[in-house]
């Protein structure tokens, strides 16, 4: 039996890895080893067994929610006697830098596409709604990149509002991790999806400084939300490992914003990454990201090697 744990006034059903694994219904995997390699991050050794044990049951749970949502929307259209555009099921996915949000989002997108009821699944990251570096520099916010004030929240909320309203073509700005900046004139077009996954560190934050659109928050548009969690010391280690791997890959590109760090020694690289964590990412985690964890419908608790140790499902 699952145990019940009260987490900051939010009761969760806490399932161990074995309990969660036992919920899986599917007998086959809609993904192979080669496809998995293309989806996982640099230092995330996720296996097909991990996909089968953790991510397939999660996709099955999301399928239950998404199809129930679709039926409700259909019944509402019938009740009001109009052919209103279909409103997609929106999943919010939050968590710290380097915790593995992007891999989780890509895996869920791949798995959810396997159902004919919702084969069109779009993935949008909130990185595209960061202000351009030029704007951040002018406002003295480059060291606050990733903090709530570094995002164009009104634009993100307008985007989500249009998507949720069923607008047929909605554009999202594109962010380049190579240049560490918004790609001017480039957009991702969201066209009548069944499901949209919105991934970003900030998606569950309630930013009370947003005076342009009062009392409206990014999470208001979510039908289900997920928080990917791990101990901070583990996340820091993953962050350092990723930085070192990028030194030998992306940082070698002359167009990379971090090209100047490619020749740091191993000790220097670890010291630099640790400093960035302590002064920026760790501060953001404690001030803005971690406090939102218990607003999520489901928490994936990671242990070593990005393997999930337990799953917490909110009851209210």
UniProtKB/Swiss-Prot annotation:
Enzyme Commission code(s) on record: 2.7.1.33
Residues engaged in binding ATP: 95-102
Residues that span the membrane, as ranges: none
One example of a Gene Ontology biological process annotation: coenzyme A biosynthetic process
Chain coiled-coil ranges: none
GO CC list: cytoplasm
Reactions mediated catalytically: (R)-pantothenate + ATP = (R)-4'-phosphopantothenate + ADP + H(+)
A matching Pfam family: PRK
Record pathway: Cofactor biosynthesis; coenzyme A biosynthesis; CoA from (R)-pantothenate: step 1/5
Disulfides per UniProt: none
UniProt entry tagged with the keyword Cell inner membrane: no
InterPro entries: P-loop_NTPase, PanK, PRK/URK
MF-aspect GO terms: ATP binding; pantothenate kinase activity
Family annotation (NCBIfam families): panK_bact
Similarity annotation: Belongs to the prokaryotic pantothenate kinase family.
Protein name per the record: Pantothenate kinase
């Amino acid at each position: 039996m699952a145990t019940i744990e009260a987490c900051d006034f939010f009761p969760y059903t806490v399932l161990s890895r074995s309990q969660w694994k036992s919920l899986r219904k599917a007998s086959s995997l809609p993904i192979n080893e080669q496809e998995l390699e293309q989806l996982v991050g640099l230092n995330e050794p996720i296996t097909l067994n991990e996909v089968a044990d953790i991510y397939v049951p999660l996709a099955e749970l999301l399928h239950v929610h998404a199809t129930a949502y679709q039926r409700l929307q259909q019944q509402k259209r019938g009740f009001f006697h109009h052919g209103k555009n279909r409103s997609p099921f929106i999943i919010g996915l939050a968590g710290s830098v380097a915790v593995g949000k992007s891999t989780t989002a890509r895996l869920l997108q791949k798995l959810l596409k396997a159902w004919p009821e919702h084969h069109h699944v779009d993935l949008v990251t909130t990185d595209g709604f960061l202000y351009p570096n030029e704007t951040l520099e002018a406002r003295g916010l480059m060291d606050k990149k990733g903090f709530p004030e570094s995002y164009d929240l009104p634009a993100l909320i307008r985007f989500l509002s249009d998507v949720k309203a069923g607008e047929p073509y909605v554009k999202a700005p594109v962010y380049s991790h190579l240049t560490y900046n918004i790609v001017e004139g480039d957009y991702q077009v969201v066209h009548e999806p069944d499901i949209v996954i919105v991934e970003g560190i900030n998606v569950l934050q309630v930013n009370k400084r947003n005076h342009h659109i009062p009392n409206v928050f990014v999470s208001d548009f979510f039908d289900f939300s997920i928080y990917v969690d791990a101990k901070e010391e583990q996340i820091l280690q993953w962050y350092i490992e990723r930085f070192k791997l990028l030194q030998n890959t992306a940082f070698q590109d002359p167009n990379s914003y971090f090209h100047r760090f490619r020749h740091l020694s191993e000790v220097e690289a670890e010291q630099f990454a640790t400093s960035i964590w302590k002064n920026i990412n760790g501060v953001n985690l404690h001030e803005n990201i971690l406090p939102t964890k218990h607003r999520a419908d489901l928490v994936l608790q990671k242990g070593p090697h990005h393997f999930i140790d337990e799953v917490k499902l909110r009851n209210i």
